[in-house]
UniProtKB/Swiss-Prot annotation:
Domain of life: Eukaryota
Annotated GO CC locations: nucleolus
Upper taxonomic lineage: Eukaryota, Viridiplantae, Streptophyta, Embryophyta, Tracheophyta
Annotated organism of origin: Arabidopsis thaliana (Mouse-ear cress)
Pfam families hit by this protein: GeBP-like_C (PF22757), GeBP-like_DBD (PF04504)
Name assigned to this protein: Probable transcription factor At4g00390
Family named by the database record: Belongs to the GeBP family.
Spans annotated as Disordered: 1-149
Amino acid sequence: MTKKLDPPTAPSSDEDDVETSEDDSSSSEEDEPIKSLPATTAAAPAKSTAVSAATPAKSTSVSAAAPSKSTAVSAAADSDSGSESETDSDSESTDPPKSGSGKTIASKKKDDPSSSTATLALPAVKSGAKRAASEAATTSTKRVKKDEESVKKPALFQRLWSDDDEISMLQGMIDYHADTGKSPSADTNAFYEFQKKSISFEVSKSQFSDKVRSLRKKYRAKEGKDEPRFVKAHDKKAFELSKFIWGPKGIALDSNAKSNGVSKKSASKTKEKLDSVKQDLAFVGVSSTNGDDWFEKSSLARMIAGSGIDEYYVRQKWSSFTLETKKIVEEKFQLMQAKELEAMLDKSVRLTDLTSYFVDASKN
């Protein structure tokens, strides 16, 4: 016999609504993007309450189903992020319902965007720190290299002679004259050996001579001025020392300085001495009462005898001359000797001038 089967009982409307609500909520969870704004979460319970008031039966069933869904979603969120708690997931269980649905929808809690942003930004921060550290190291290395180069490279146009060196040079010229009684220009090599240890650096002979000429030229530039002005006290002190050296009564020799220490000033003194000698000779010749003494003591007899005449004969004839003749001869020879001395002096002065030209040429 064929047994009739009872038709399946139709589900109640409440069950249909619950299933429909579950399907809608599941589809909304798949379709909607995850939202976790606090304002939306806070507004969700109020809207859910309003929907529940409109449909009590549905609200009850949905409320019963929503926690389970929310709990599952919270568990999934905890497993993914590892940073959210069950309390936070339960409190944010629902999202605002779709417009026109009239049903509360349980939404899946969205991951915290701040934690995701922090996780993504962390490598960038580390990269920036490494870059800043590398740039700082590079800058420090460049600065060290630059400092080393600045130390290695000597400064251009570096001044060798300091103010103290100039004063020491001028004072050394005065001290050299006081110790030796000679002018520093008389023997430049001796003065160089005397003074070079007082200079702050190892000075060469050419540098030494150039500095002496430079100081003398600097003094000459201010010498002709009535009231020379000085910017620094050093310039004034150097001028006073230079005046003592190259001034009108200075100890050093000017461009006419001679290698043997004789200057025109000393030559004029020599000339004065010669004039006095000439006067003495003239006085002796005029006042001489016995011309034989002068002739006998002179070399004239030997000079005449040297030309081939007997010396005894010359002396004998000289004694036969009258006194007036002897005086005339004596005066003439004395004048001749004075002229010879003047010629010798003039020759000495000219040789001295010529020597000074050679000295100046050797310094250049």
